[in-house]
C-alpha cells in the first residue's frame, strides 16, 4: 500500500481557537453570589468574599491590584476570571447653586448622567438606572432618547463610588462615604430594570458595602403597577410616585404608562404598599402652566390621595426645548400648595437644582457630550 504524502491530504480550515471564558463582572455580584464565585470558581475559602466585597464597595477599588491584603495568587486568579467594569468620567458641569452633573461613559460607549446636590445638612446623589428610557413621558428629555439598554448593578453602584471619590477629592472629606442620601430619579425607569436595581440596592445597603440606611434611599417610578408590589415585598427603601396629573385624560397625554395602568390602578397599588411605621409615599407632581396647575387639579388631587399616607413634592416644570410645555410661576405654585395644605395634604414646593446645567428634574439627556475633563455646556 502506497504511503500518502502530506501534500495529498485534504485541505481544511484550521479549527478556531476556543473562545476565552467570559470574565465575571464581579462588582455586579451580591455578597452571596460573590461567596459562591470565590469558593466554587476560584477554590478559595469563604472569608475571602467579604474581604473582596469591602474592597469593591467600601473603598471603591477600581482594580484588583489595589486589594493589597489579598495574596498575589488570589489577585492573579481574580484577573484571570473576573473584571471590574469601569465608568469613565466624560465631564462634569457645575451649577451656580452648587449642583454638579457628572457624565459617565460606559465601556460600550454609552453615556449616563448622575447629579450631586449638596446642601448644609445632606449630600444627595441622583442616580441613573438605564441608558435612556422607554416610558416616553412627554415633558421629560430622557424620554426623547428611547431606551438603549439597562445598566448593570455594577454600573448603578459605580456612580455612587465615583461621586464619593469626587466629593472626597474636591471637598476634603476623610470619610469613605461622604454621600448621605440616594435618589433613583436619574435617567431611566428604575422598576423597568428591577432585578439589577434590587441587586444594586443590596450592595448599597450592605454592612460590607457603603451601608446606606433604608431611610436615606428613595426610588421613583412612573407607575409600573405590578412592579410596585414586588418592590414593596423585596426591598425596604422609600417609594416615590411620579403622578403629575389629576385626571386620566391629562396623565395619558403626557405619560403613556397611564394607558396601561391608570390612576385608579396606580393608587390602589399605593394603598396596598407595605409601609414601615411613620413612613409615607412621596408623590411627585410636576407643575405645568395651563395644563395641570388649576385650582380644580389641586382639589381633585386631595380626593385622589385620601387614605394614603403621603407627602406631595410640587416641582415647577423645568423647560426643555422643543417639548412645548412651560413652567408654572412661583405665585401660582404657592397657591396650589396652599389648597393642598387646606385639604390636609402635606405639600412642598421643591427647589429645582442644576437647571442651568440641564441637571434638574426631567432634563437629563446627555446634551453637550464632551471629552473627558471639559466643562462645556454646549
UniProtKB/Swiss-Prot annotation:
Annotated positions binding S-adenosyl-L-methionine: 188-189, 220, 242-244, 318
Subcellular location: Cytoplasm
Domain spans labelled Radical SAM core: 119-355
InterPro entries linked to this entry: Aldolase_TIM, Elp3/MiaA/NifB-like_rSAM, Methyltransferase_A, RlmN_N, RNA_MTrfase_RlmN, rRNA_lsu_MTrfase_RlmN/Cfr, rSAM
Alphabetized UniProt keyword annotations: 4Fe-4S, Cytoplasm, Disulfide bond, Iron, Iron-sulfur, Metal-binding, Methyltransferase, rRNA processing, S-adenosyl-L-methionine, Transferase, tRNA processing
PROSITE patterns: RADICAL_SAM
Cystine pairs: 126-361
Cofactor(s) needed for function: [4Fe-4S] cluster
Principal EC category: transferase
EC number: 2.1.1.192
GO terms (BP aspect): rRNA base methylation; tRNA methylation
One CC-aspect GO term: cytoplasm
Active site annotation, chain numbering: 113, 361
Positions contributing to [4Fe-4S] cluster binding: 133, 137, 140
Superkingdom of origin: Bacteria
SMART domains per UniProt: Elp3
Function: Specifically methylates position 2 of adenine 2503 in 23S rRNA and position 2 of adenine 37 in tRNAs. m2A2503 modification seems to play a crucial role in the proofreading step occurring at the peptidyl transferase center and thus would serve to optimize ribosomal fidelity.
Family to which this protein belongs: Belongs to the radical SAM superfamily. RlmN family.
NCBIfam families noted in UniProt: rRNA_mod_RlmN
Protein name (database record): Dual-specificity RNA methyltransferase RlmN 2
The organism of origin for this protein: Myxococcus xanthus (strain DK1622)
Amino acid at each position: 500500500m502506497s504511503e500518502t504524502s502530506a501534500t495529498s491530504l485534504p485541505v481544511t480550515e484550521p479549527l478556531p481557537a476556543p473562545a476565552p471564558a467570559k470574565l465575571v463582572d464581579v462588582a455586579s455580584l451580591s455578597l452571596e453570589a460573590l461567596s459562591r464565585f470565590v469558593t466554587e470558581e476560584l477554590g478559595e475559602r469563604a472569608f475571602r468574599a467579604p474581604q473582596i466585597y469591602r474592597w469593591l464597595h467600601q473603598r471603591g477599588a477600581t482594580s484588583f491590584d489595589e486589594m493589597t491584603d489579598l495574596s498575589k495568587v488570589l489577585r492573579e486568579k481574580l484577573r484571570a476570571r473576573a473584571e471590574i467594569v469601569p465608568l469613565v468620567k466624560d465631564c462634569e458641569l457645575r451649577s451656580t447653586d452648587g449642583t454638579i452633573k457628572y457624565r459617565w461613559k460606559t465601556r460600550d460607549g454609552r453615556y449616563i448622567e448622575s447629579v450631586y446636590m449638596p446642601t448644609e445638612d445632606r449630600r444627595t446623589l441622583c442616580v441613573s438606572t438605564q441608558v435612556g428610557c422607554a416610558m416616553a413621558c412627554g415633558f421629560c428629555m430622557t424620554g426623547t432618547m428611547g431606551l438603549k439598554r439597562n445598566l448593570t448593578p455594577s454600573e448603578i453602584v459605580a456612580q455612587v463610588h465615583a461621586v464619593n471619590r469626587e466629593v472626597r477629592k474636591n471637598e476634603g472629606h476623610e470619610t469613605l462615604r461622604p454621600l448621605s442620601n440616594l435618589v433613583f430619579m436619574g435617567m431611566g425607569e428604575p422598576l423597568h430594570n428591577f432585578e439589577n436595581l434590587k441587586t444594586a440596592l443590596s450592595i448599597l445597603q450592605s454592612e460590607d458595602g457603603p451601608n446606606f440606611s433604608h431611610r436615606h434611599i428613595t426610588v421613583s417610578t412612573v407607575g409600573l403597577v405590578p412592579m410596585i408590589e414586588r418592590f414593596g415585598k423585596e426591598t425596604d427603601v422609600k417609594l416615590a410616585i411620579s403622578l403629575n396629573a389629576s385626571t386620566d385624560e391629562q396623565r395619558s397625554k403626557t405619560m403613556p404608562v397611564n394607558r396601561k395602568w391608570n390612576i385608579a390602578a396606580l393608587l390602589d397599588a399605593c394603598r396596598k404598599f407595605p409601609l414601615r411605621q411613620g413612613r409615607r409615599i412621596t408623590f411627585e407632581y410636576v407643575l405645568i402652566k395651563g395644563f395641570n396647575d388649576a385650582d380644580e387639579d389641586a382639589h381633585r388631587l386631595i380626593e385622589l390621595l385620601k387614605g394614603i399616607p403621603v407627602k406631595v413634592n410640587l416641582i415647577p416644570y423645568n423647560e426643555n426645548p422643543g417639548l412645548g410645555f412651560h413652567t408654572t410661576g412661583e405665585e401660582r405654585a404657592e397657591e396650589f400648595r396652599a389648597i393642598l395644605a387646606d385639604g390636609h395634604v402635606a405639600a412642598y414646593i421643591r427647589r429645582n437644582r442644576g437647571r442651568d446645567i440641564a441637571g434638574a428634574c426631567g432634563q437629563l439627556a446627555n446634551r453637550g457630550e464632551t471629552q473627558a475633563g471639559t466643562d462645556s455646556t454646549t
